[in-house]
Amino acid sequence: MRILLLLLQNILVFCQFLQTIKVGLMFSKDTASVIRSVGYRTSAAAVLVAKDRIRAEHLLDQYDFNFTIKFDECSESLAAGKVVELLTHDNVDVIIGPTCNRAGVAVASLADFYNVPVFQWGLTTTADIGNFSRYQTTVTLSLDTHSISLAVREILRQYGWSEFVFIYSNDGDEEKCAAMKDDMEKMGIENSDVTMAYMIQIQTVTMESLQRTLLEVSKRGRIIIACFASGRGFKKAFIASTVLAGMSTEEYLYVFAEPQSRGFYVDEADGKVHYSWDDTDGQLVTGLTNEQIRDAYGKVLYICDNMGEPTTITTQYTNFTSQVISRMAEQPFNCVQDCSNQSYKHAATYAGQLADSFYAYAFALNKSLTQDPTRSNLKNGSFVLSNIGMTFQGVGGEAVTLDESGSRIVQVYMFAMNSSLLPYMAASLLVNVSEVVFTPFYKSESELWSVRPLSRPKCGFTGLECPADFVKEYLVYTIIAAFIVILALLAGCAGLLYTMHMKRKEMERQDLLWQVAFVELQQVQSKSRAEASMHSFASGPSTSTKMTVESRTETTNFIFYHYHQEVVAAKKHDLLVLFDANQKSEFRQMRNFDNDNLNKFIGLCLDGPQLLSLWRFCSRGSLSDVISKSSMQMDSFFMFSLIRDISNGLYFIHSSFLKCHGQLTSRCCLIDDRWQIKISGFGLKSVRTFENPKKEDLLWASPEYLRNEDQERLPEGDIYSFGIICAEILTRSSAFDLENRKEKPDVIIYQVKKGGHNPTRPSLDTGETVVINPALLHLVRDCWTERPSERPSIEQVRSHLNGMKDGRKTNLMDHVFNMLETYASTLEEEVSDRTKELTEEKKKSDVLLYRMLPRMVADKLKLGQTVEPETFEQVTIFFSDVVQFTTLAGKCTPLQVVTLLNDLYTIFDGIIEQNDVYKVETIGDGYLCVSGLPHRNGNDHIRHIARMSLGFLSSLEFFRVQHLPAERINLRIGINCGSVVAGVVGLTMPRYCLFGDAVNTASRMESNGKPGQIHVTAEANRMLTQVVGGFRTESRGEVIIKGKGVMETFWLLGEESGYTAPSKAAPKVIQHRQSIRSISPILEKNAEGSETSSLSVDQAGDNNSETV
């Protein structure tokens, strides 16, 4: 005993000092296309098996594991969000998953940024994820498409095939074949001895599209490599199409090269496999027998991993898959009910990779911690993966080898059909980075084919390349060739002349687009006195609201016109210029500019009193005026959106033929009615060359331009101007805050031009009211550095700005409206809040009222109207009672009784919602329902009640008491048809009650029924069998009913097709220990002479009914 106590003490001390490794697991749970291969319910427990192995091998003995599970559903955006939660909220040390390509790329990118190790598995087959130079913290154990392409290249070399055709389709799987296509295309480009002669994509796989494609391919190649989605019957249809197209001869060879493949086999839902030619998934009508298609498979090779051959699955792997399924009920998955479906009884195809991935991580981490045991190294992806080189035995018994870069050295196999038309493993290919070792398992190539196919037939693909008789053909060919040459020359000359003519016409047409006639311009008429001192056409009296164009008629620099029912701003140019062809080309291209953050260039007016350049009018003015005159406060999101808009517009300009703006100021940044920045004033270099810039515009000019105004404007100068504009936005003041400085613009310009170690720049004091990202301030300072070479490019600026996003996707216009609403009167807000609260409370009260009373009755009571009693000539009344409920309740606490009834009645309520049935009362274990009121439904009331009753009994087969799983619930049900009177009784607590002898009779049917049986009256039986039909009943015979005498009653057995009630031998129920009769507010007259009964809250039961 003393030794045992010491041992327990040591264990407790050991546990207290265990550190926890937080493991993030990412799965796809409900994506139907990947459930069989990587589904959560059939693979997640593999980490527990791997954990046991880690413990058995004494890896990471000082650490325990804590698992956090996220479901990405193979969605790129969802995976990105979930991995951010894991990294920032859950603070995991490693991520295992995800299992799909697009999600995998998103997670690998983020993990590389956070330097957290990621081990991916399953369907992550794209070569991008395995690119260690790109994702240095990600390891994948999946067979990727790059390895497959290398194996294909080696097979082509082995058999002397220099060219091939690639056919693929993304129908049914948008990831697998798209990745395969990229690597096959890359392989064909990078290898001079292997050429991809033709590649074609089939958008929608049908027998017609397959045959059309094959006929086209027959003109391009004989070695055909194909990739299709698995589990859709596409491969079978493709091979069938080769037969129908006459291409299943020895001349052709078809290679299915793809990851996630089972080779000649197809998975079934029960975990078994069958041959591909027997595939019935998504079966396309081929018109051929399976035997005919099987014969055509003799011209097929499969390149895949050892999952393509069921005979390679070891006993060790079979035991592993059994553990995966059985341990899903353990922590942290606790998947019992959700995993109970029969389709989840077999482990996912790639569950073994999950276990191997987790073990590889533990192996690498253990080795890393041996070198440096500091805690920070747990999630240091670069450090952990520096020891990723390893070789270990996988769960399936095969050797798993990773090199120092984390790339898996994979073993790929070539499968073929033998002479007996049965699949066999023909060769293996060991793929190590770029080297492939080919090992054939056959003794002679005759086992593969009688004659090796040629990549190019001797007479060509059309059979016309064999030399013909020169003497016979020479004269005819010469005449035809000469004729063709003459026609070609004539056609070429005519085509050239026509092209030149059309090009000249097109240029003239496009020139007409930017040349605006002065007569087409109608000057805007002012409604009021013209605004004075408008220093730019974008300025205005207020930017809080949209300004009317009538307030803008003419300024010093601009005139405002109507042109084609659109308001335009015409900039005045006091010069006349004759434009050459290059300048006209510039105007044509500017006219075609279409970007959300560039103001539309309309054109030039050359025939007016002076030269005018026309631009689209922006109603909210310029950014300069918004900053200087707006009374609306800008928050950080508003500022960031404005800066981002400017960077996007500037990026478009720098990427275009213009290369730079040259005169970027905040006055050029216009704001439209959606609060979006539109950069204006770009281009027109030939016009600006002869114009002197205004002094105040030089506040945005770069120092190098101020020192030499004759030099050409460069993109670096735009970046400087961008920095000045950003300072205006962040400080909500003009450039260099002239209003609050003593210096005049000339002095500031001189100081900027002078430069020095501490050059003059605007202040970046943003105040305390707005929180600005410090990284944004650093970026602004980088933009206005003295040396142009040290300033970031616009691409770098955009990249930095994208990195500063806070994850919000709010539109700026919506944000502005939110700001305006925020600054609305407090009275309006309070009224709105109170109105919302009142509406919500009204909704809650309505929901509660509609649960207590029928909607039409409740609506009348709400309106203060009297609900008159109403007679319903024919309805069906339903009573039920839980058998031996008192005995069952005696084994439960009061709270457990409530939970039991809540679970049971929740199921019943769901069944009621599927039928036109009104639930009157539930008191204790009693249940009263009626159909045919308050809405009359003809004779359908008996059908709805019957189906509901059958549904109740059917649901009990799967219902389990949570705290007493061995116990079973059984019901006794009674049904009667007849007339009733329904009305509302009471004022303080009004109840919708039923009155009539039919109610009492239905209650007697229940109390005189048997467990698990539906007891119906003769009238109900007549309605079921003669009126509505479709139900099976059985006569019980004559029964003495209390208060009714002798009655013939019946059992409802079920519908003609559908659920059937259990046999009369009811299942064993809880032993009756005591009988407690409880009658709630029920009006039940003397049982012997009662002609009318009423029921408001409970049923009138017999001695064998219990209520708790």
Swiss-Prot record:
Residues 1-15 form the signal peptide. Its main location: membrane. Residues 1083-1108 are annotated as: Disordered. Pfam families: ANF_receptor (PF01094), Guanylate_cyc (PF00211), PK_Tyr_Ser-Thr (PF07714). Expressed asymmetrically in ASE left (ASEL) sensory neuron. Expressed in excretory gland and canal cell. Residues 496-1108 are cytoplasmic. It is a single-pass type I membrane protein. It is found in: Cell membrane. Residues 1089-1108 have a biased composition (Polar residues). InterPro entries: A/G_cyclase (IPR001054), A/G_cyclase_CS (IPR018297), ANF_lig-bd_rcpt (IPR001828), Cyclic_nucleotide_synthase (IPR050401), Kinase-like_dom_sf (IPR011009), Nucleotide_cyclase (IPR029787), Peripla_BP_I (IPR028082), Prot_kinase_dom (IPR000719). Its EC number is 4.6.1.2. ATP binds at residues 489-497, 571. Keywords: ATP-binding, Cell membrane, cGMP biosynthesis, Glycoprotein, GTP-binding, Lyase, Membrane, Nucleotide-binding, Receptor, Signal, Transmembrane, Transmembrane helix. Coiled coil: none annotated. Residues 483-803 form the Protein kinase domain. It comes from the Eukaryota. It catalyses: GTP = 3',5'-cyclic GMP + diphosphate. One of its GO terms (molecular function) is protein kinase activity. Guanylate cyclase involved in the production of the second messenger cGMP. The protein kinase domain is predicted to be catalytically inactive. This is Receptor-type guanylate cyclase gcy-20. It comes from Caenorhabditis elegans. The lineage of its organism: Eukaryota, Metazoa, Ecdysozoa, Nematoda, Chromadorea. The gene is gcy-20.
